Amino acid sequence: VTRAPAVRRRRRRWPCAAALTVLGLIAAMVLTRDSSKFEYRDAADTAAHRLDTGPLVPSALDVQWWVRDHPGDARAAAIRDRIARHPIAMWATGNDEDDSRNIGDIVTRARDAGGTAQLVLYNIPDRDDGFSGPHHAVTPRVYRAWVDRVSALVGDARLVLIVEPDALWFADRQSLEGTDFGDRIDSLRYVVETFSARNANTRVYVDAGTSSGSVTPERMAALLAKVGVSDRVGYAVNVSSFAPTAEITAYAQRIRAALQQWFGIPDPRYVVDTSQNGNPDWNFDWCNPAGRILGTPPAVLGHHDGLDMNLWILAPGSSNGPCGAAPDAPGGQFSPALATALLR
């Protein structure tokens, strides 16, 4: 399974401006009470807005493979029982051969299990914005063609899609409202529109960063509205990050309130990456910080307050880069030492 590339993902602080627009939108949404699944219903077009997840299907196998290949390692049993048995998302990073094989595999396993796969798109032009070296050399045209291929591979399979971690988080650094900013917004909107039009059983969540203060919730809501977040397209918070549940919930709820009040979206939905947020506090250290612990296991919730799912979007034990508690582990590489540290 493709791993996230060896990049250092950084959550910086900088001043932000809020863009306020009021749109009119009326819809109706009903959630089932079965905790294993949820359905979205829109009064205008029920079939187009329904997603019955069934079980979440493991989509990233790095951890399972490590356990399989290290039967004599004293850490293997604990990693197997407390991490590997949970469904974890797969990351697609632009390697066409790996992406085709891996996406085909998770789609097949989801269909066979009657469940839902989890996929992260992480291939946006200028990914990581050069913080870890040269900018990601993908043009908007090449990116759109890649999105088309991924959409075709997914087809009618049931999928939770997380769209481009950090892309909106760094958008304002690309000369506010300038050409690069516009390209990024257009690329993300293309993902949203493509999967909304072609993949009826895919639920899309655009990454909305975390609660470190680098981007205000109100500014993030404005950015999410620009790329097409609506009642049928949600947002994801805390991806690959460590904000505790209370803190990240407050951040997500402020985004939700802004989307409702300023952009006329009656019931914005979101998911939370809880893979590494079991601590009650966080000092905003983003790169393999010591002392972190596992968070709440993945679960489909469908709460009335907008929370659809707790997910493990980054595999617990995956390195953020060669730093912190894993100075020798490249970004995206599974580190049994990091994984074991999370099991305290």
Regions found by a protein language model. Name each.
Residues 53-61, 89-90, 115-119, 159-163, ...:
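Hydrophobic faces of well-ordered beta-strands that scaffold small-molecule active sites
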